[in-house]
Design a protein with these regions (language model features):
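Conserved alpha-helix/loop element of class I SAM-dependent methyltransferases that forms part
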Residues: 2-18
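C-terminal lobe and adjacent flexible extensions of AdoMet/dcAdoMet transferase-like proteins
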Residues: 190-230
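Conserved class I S-adenosyl-L-methionine
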Residues: 19-26
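A short glycine-rich, Lys/Arg-flanked "PGG" loop and its adjoining helix->strand segment in the class I
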Residues: 102-114
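Short glycine-centered segments of the SAM/dcSAM-binding site in methyltransferase folds
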Residues: 21, 116-117
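Class I SAM-dependent methyltransferase SAM/SAH-binding core
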Residues: 31-76
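SAM-dependent methyltransferase
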Residues: 119-194
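A short acidic, Gly/Pro-enriched loop at the edge of an enzyme's catalytic core
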Residues: 78-85
């Protein structure tokens, strides 16, 4: 499976082993944290989803793994620990605003040991070019994702060509209330990634097609970045 391949590549690329300190921002149910802790790394996983963190904690307890899970919005996460490697996977970086990205990268810089690394993935401009502006209306839009009860859902997708940003605006209409969710996604070129990282004290070491170390392709819908603290 991709996660196994990816974790194996990380182990060899970053020399992950006993005593290595790793932080996984947006760790979810611990898919990476669990695998890296099995290599005797000391892992911290941060995620906003209580259900995911509970599942991850149960897995760690069952396998007696050294993982510290934190149920928190990672934008608010603080620690005195210093890490050799920081992960942010599943293109989470793209969902942050420019100010949030700057905050995150500055924190990553502070949280890392000297010459520590960041590995993250982002959506490419190819993926941006594939996105279309559209309007969609559906009863129980996204198969009931937004509410356990009945509702009507509207999705409006807007593209911002200059900024390379896409907005998915969801309007959910229930019997008792109506609310709106704004999902912003930033799409990147390698040059834009490099600009943001170098402004926060990082040097880009390599680009890959994904977080399993597949060679970089300019045709891909996403790409991965390894950056080193300067």
């Amino acid at each position: 499976a991709f996660i196994d391949r990816s974790a194996d590549w990380m182990v060899s690329r970053f020399g992950i082993g006993t005593g290595m300190m790793i932080a996984d921002f947006g760790c979810g149910p611990g898919l990476y944290a669990t695998r890296l802790a099995r290599k005797n790394a000391i892992v911290t996983g941060i995620d906003f989803s209580n259900r995911s963190i509970q599942y991850a904690r149960e897995t760690a307890a069952r396998e007696k793994l050294l993982v510290h899970y934190v149920h928190q919005n990672y934008l608010d996460f603080e620690t005195d620990d210093r890490f050799h490697l920081i992960l942010m996977i599943m293109c989470d970086f793209c969902a942050l605003s420019p100010a949030q990205r700057k905050t995150m990268l500055s924190r990553f810089h502070r949280f890392l040991e000297p010459s520590g690394s960041v590995l993250l993935d982002v959506y490419s401009l190819n993926a941006f070019n594939e996105r279309k502006e559209r309007t969609l209306y559906e009863p129980n839009l996204l198969n009931g994702f937004w509410s356990p009860g009945k509702y009507f859902g509207f999705l409006n997708t807007f593209k911002y060509e200059k900024e390379k940003v896409v907005l998915d605006k969801y309007t959910i209409i229930e019997a008792q209330r109506t609310y709106t969710i704004y999902n912003w996604l930033q799409y990147f070129s390698p040059e834009n990634v490099e600009r943001e990282f170098s402004a926060c004290g990082f040097a880009i070491e390599s680009y890959f097609a994904d977080v399993a170390g597949t060679p970089f392709s300019s045709q891909g819908r996403e790409f991965a970045v390894v950056a080193k603290k300067q």
